[in-house]
């Protein structure tokens, strides 16, 4: 399955590579997002590649995901809809709390992700993986040791990495692995200064890493071709772009980038279907709708055998069967609710039905 996903991502990248794209992104974070105006820096990177990023940002200093989950401003921006991506970034220390104290982080992320998917069925959630502080977190070491093993960059960064990967998997979301590239640069190019004097916030070079790390998954293009270097020297910018190519672009699946595209495409298609009026198309007819027990499908052309997929309202694949011509599907064991029928590998073939 992973090999198939990699091949599909390679094909998609090839198809979009020469195309100019426009994306709309909402950034919800704090000063790690706001410093150096990261969204505008990403937009500048995109412009240098012939692409366009339209963006909005809500990033008050010190904000947690919990703060965004109860903020009328953040919620209103999510509900305005039509975002291709909503990027979520938590306060850096929140991702290094003991396991017993992570509930609020996970529940806030789940709530925000649910709001995003409800109001942006054609969009995706992406988490902004940040980095460990330059010399670790001595305060959390004092408070939480011995669980907090050591006040080092390495320990803090490993926790942040682990938690962002877990939270993205929990929510079928993508990750922009800024912290992973940050780690690579620290190990292999220590001469590039990534931090401000506070040993926490990003320098211009640190924000440039983030900009390239976001451009790459948002547009699925090779960052080495980016011509915008901000105020960095050509050598520094090239080193960073090479690192992003190695860590991110060459390993998109590792960061969940693209692996939920099929789920999102079903949710997007379903948002544009009306259960009362869109009961058939040139590839598929379906009746009755609503349905109680047996759903009848007619697949065209009748001689073609296809994979018929049934998804629940959240985009989770719950059944896949092979069929051609007329098929009668027993759905009595399904819970009452909204479902979607999709013909695999047939673009724009998705219908909504109600089980009652």
Predicted features and spans:
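Conserved SGNH/GDSL esterase-like catalytic core that processes O-acyl groups on lipids
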Residues: 22-26, 32-115, 121
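C-terminal outer-membrane/trafficking sorting elements
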Residues: 276-356
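Conserved catalytic region of serine esterases and O-acyltransferases that act on ester linkages
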Residues: 194, 201, 205, 211-272
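Extracytoplasmic/secreted proteins, especially bacterial periplasmic and envelope-associated proteins
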Residues: 27, 37-44, 73, 104-111, ...
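Ser/Thr-glycine-rich phosphate-binding loops at phosphate-binding pockets of nucleotides
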Residues: 30-31, 203
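Bacterial Sec-dependent N-terminal signal peptides
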Residues: 1-21, 275
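Alpha-helical cap/lid subdomain in secreted, periplasmic
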Residues: 77-200, 216
């Amino acid at each position: 399955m992973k090999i198939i996903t990699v091949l599909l991502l390679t094909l998609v990248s090839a198809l979009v590579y020469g195309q100019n794209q426009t994306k709309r992104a909402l950034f919800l974070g704090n000063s790690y997002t706001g410093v150096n105006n990261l969204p505008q820096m990403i937009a500048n990177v995109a412009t240098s590649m012939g692409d366009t990023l339209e963006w909005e940002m809500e990033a008050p200093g010190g904000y947690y995901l919990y703060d965004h989950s109860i903020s009328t401003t953040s919620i209103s921006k999510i509900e305005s809809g039509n975002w291709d991506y909503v990027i979520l970034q938590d306060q850096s220390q929140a991702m290094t709390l003991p396991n017993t104290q992570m509930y609020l982080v996970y529940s806030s992320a789940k709530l925000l992700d649910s709001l995003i998917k409800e109001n942006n069925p054609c969009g995706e959630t992406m988490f902004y993986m940040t980095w460990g502080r330059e010399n670790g977190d001595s305060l959390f070491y004092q408070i939480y040791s011995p669980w907090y093993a050591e006040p080092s960059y390495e320990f803090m960064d490993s926790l942040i990495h682990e938690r962002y990967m877990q939270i993205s998997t929990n929510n079928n979301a993508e990750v922009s692995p800024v912290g992973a590239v940050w780690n690579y640069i620290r190990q292999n190019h220590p001469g590039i200064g990534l931090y401000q004097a506070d040993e926490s916030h990003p320098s211009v070079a640190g924000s440039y890493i983030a900009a390239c790390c976001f451009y790459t998954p948002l547009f699925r293009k090779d960052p080495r071709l980016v011509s915008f270097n901000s105020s960095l020297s050509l050598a520094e910018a090239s080193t960073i772009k090479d690192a992003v190519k190695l860590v991110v672009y060459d390993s998109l699946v590792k960061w969940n980038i693209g692996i939920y595209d099929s789920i999102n495409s079903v949710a997007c298609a379903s948002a544009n279907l009306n259960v009362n009026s869109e009961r058939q198309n040139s590839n598929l007819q379906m009746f009755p709708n609503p349905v109680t027990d047996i759903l009848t499908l007619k697949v065209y052309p009748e001689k073609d055998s296809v994979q018929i997929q049934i998804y629940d309202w959240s985009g989770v694949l719950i059944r896949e069967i092979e069929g051609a011509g007329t098929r009668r599907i027993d759905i009595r064991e399904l819970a009452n609710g909204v479902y979607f029928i999709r013909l695999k590998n047939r673009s724009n073939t998705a219908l909504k039905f109600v089980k009652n």
